[in-house]
Amino acid sequence: MQVTLSVDPLLLAGAVLALTAVFVSALVTRRSRRFRVPGALLFLALGMLFGDDGLNLISLDDAELVQNVGVIALLFILLEGGLTTKPTDLKLAALPGLLLATIGVMITAGITAAGVWLFLDVDLLTAGLIGAVVGSTDAAAVFSMMRTTPLPRRTAALLRVESGSNDPIAVMLTVGLLATYDQGATAGQWVSFAAIQLIGGGIVGGAVGMLAVVTLRRTALALEGLYPITIAAFGALAYGLAVTIGASGFVAVYLTGVLVGALLPRQRRSILGFHEALANAAEIGLFLLLGLLVFPSQLPAVALPALLVTAVLTLVARPAAVWSCTLGQGYRWRERTVLSIGGLKGAVPIVLATFPLTAGTTGANLIFDVVFFVVLVSVLIQGIALLPTVKGLGFEQHQPAWAPVAEALPLEGIEIDIVELHVTADMTVAGRRLSELAIPDGSIVTAVVRNDEVIVPKGDTEIRVDDVLLITTQRDRTALQRLTAWARGEG
């Protein structure tokens, strides 16, 4: 007697595919790093190998399923991108990052669409959709490359801020074009749509992010493992509320992550570790599914058009966006060259390419195949070219790998928190010696982090603006509020 559920074969196939991907990835990690090829491409290749056009072990032709899974995966990838966006990155690159994430995506999409329409025999809608879906860079691919690419702080910060925040604009352009195809839209409706998407998403993300921060600051959860799960739930809440009112759920999710990452000092190590793993799992699963969905035998037919699109995208559209959005901000031609090459593509364009498939748009299969090919080629070329370009321009600048985080010590019976305090100009502790400061009872400054260097504090150590104080304090619900009030001279 045997009982088998319909989901059992799917679980078995999924487990075999995922484990194969992980172990093969581990075996080729050194070579992939040597040749600067993002590991995500391996998961795409494995999906293609196991799919209908390969070994035919797993059959997947449900674009709507892949799209829905892709949206969920992007939710967690963007949430993790927001959580890991450092306040120092925002300070260094907020303006150019915001410009590249908005106007830059539009410039990239517009120029690419114009090139597609001029060089390929397609209609304006198809050209516009191809431009829109390849308009953004991929956070996972960019972060992967930057881990082993020695870039100056400002350049690295700009790439991080841009890649973590530009997906919502590409989504908005794609959805807007499809809505225009289905319903027709005037220029005024486009402006209204964009405003609701961006402003509404920003408001929802800001509100949910602050709600998460206030709630978790005032609530001591029973288990440390509940903190990252709660943050994930707040991210899903932000997305759901935003799309319910017609705003951008992706803008809301990213902003929620930014606020939580910047303002919630408690349990940051466990929160970031959990969400990094969750985002990696989402990325692996997403690339495997996308590889299963594509038919490799159809790619040679679109090779020439896709190469033309890639050329326009990497040689014209991306540089034009970078140079336009960094004018008057002190960026030299070497930095702009590196920024142009560093705009790697990844899963987001392929997920967006499933939108025309599910909408039944004319030329949807062509769009998907072209975009898939463009992502493969652009990641290979840019991934391989980035480090030699950085070295050739004499632009190498190694950054310290250590980054401070606040952490509640997870040792049984030890009620201690290590609190991270960023010193700003409005704080009364700025410009004063440590011996002059009456720190609250039960707390002690154990380290000062300045320009990524750790200073062991003494009585004559001067506290400066932009320092990060690591303070050991007895764990209680009011410790963070008392330390903040102390730093601002309010108590």
Name the predicted role of every residue range:
Residues T428-T478, R482:
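Cytosolic Rossmann-like ligand/nucleotide-binding regulatory domains
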Residues V377, H422, I471-T472:
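A general boundary/transition motif marking the beginning of the first structured unit of a protein
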Residues P400-L409, V445-N451:
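Short linear loop/turn motifs
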Residues I414-V423:
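Short glycine-/aliphatic-rich beta-strand segments at the starts of folded cytosolic domains
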Residues V142-M145, T389, R433, A479-L483:
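Hydrophobic side chains in well-ordered alpha-helices
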